[in-house]
């Protein structure tokens, strides 16, 4: 798969693409990441990519033409017409289902906005989907692009040390969309806080039941809407429901 990143600050991506376990996906080409700067497609000696907003107001707006020329150059290098994603507060909040969809795709073109945003005419003409990380505003779309790339990369075969590691992540359908359970490692007692005895028992059935109940309890306390969704989807057993009833 290939992701083209349209950004005024391509240098921000260098450490991200060469660090951590997900670098395997990028360095091997399993997830091909290409960077494009709209400033390279701007006219004039100053390569200007932004201007004041019509109607007045603070800040600057990214101009449509440099973005459009940059996008056309990218599309000409791809073998298929790629969807164009814009990271924006107006977008749908990124979640596991969306990440899974993009991890199974051929990739996309990711637009990283800056300043007050993009000229709406470019959005209307080219953007096929908008994505948000949540109800807050960043200085640009680069961090959001990295979040999507990281989430997609770790789902690719051979990237994680254990192939099924991501199946135990929070929100994964394998866990019925619940939050993950707490985890512990050595020492067995730290500052008077012992590891739960069941995890030291070697009794795998009891351990798995404990983990299931911890996931249920944690999700009920912190993200009750996920419990409701799992119930609607028919993912909760009678034992699950009995445990949840005991927590009320």
Swiss-Prot record:
Record keywords: Cytoplasm, Methyltransferase, S-adenosyl-L-methionine, Transferase, tRNA processing
Cell compartments where the protein resides: Cytoplasm
First-level EC class: transferase
InterPro entries xref list: Alpha/beta_knot_MTases (IPR029028), tRNA_m1G_MeTrfase_C_sf (IPR023148), tRNA_m1G_MeTrfase_TrmD (IPR002649), tRNA_m1G_MTases_N (IPR029026), tRNA_MeTrfase_TRMD/TRM10 (IPR016009)
Superkingdom: Bacteria
Disulfide-bonded cysteines: none
Known EC number: 2.1.1.228
One protein family per Pfam: tRNA_m1G_MT
Chief place of localization: cytoplasm
Binding site for S-adenosyl-L-methionine: 113, 133-138
GO molecular function, one term: tRNA (guanine(37)-N1)-methyltransferase activity
Catalytically driven reaction(s): guanosine(37) in tRNA + S-adenosyl-L-methionine = N(1)-methylguanosine(37) in tRNA + S-adenosyl-L-homocysteine + H(+)
GO BP terms, alphabetized: tRNA N1-guanine methylation
GO cellular component: cytosol
Protein family: Belongs to the RNA methyltransferase TrmD family.
Subunit annotation: Homodimer.
Function: Specifically methylates guanosine-37 in various tRNAs.
Name of this protein: tRNA (guanine-N(1)-)-methyltransferase
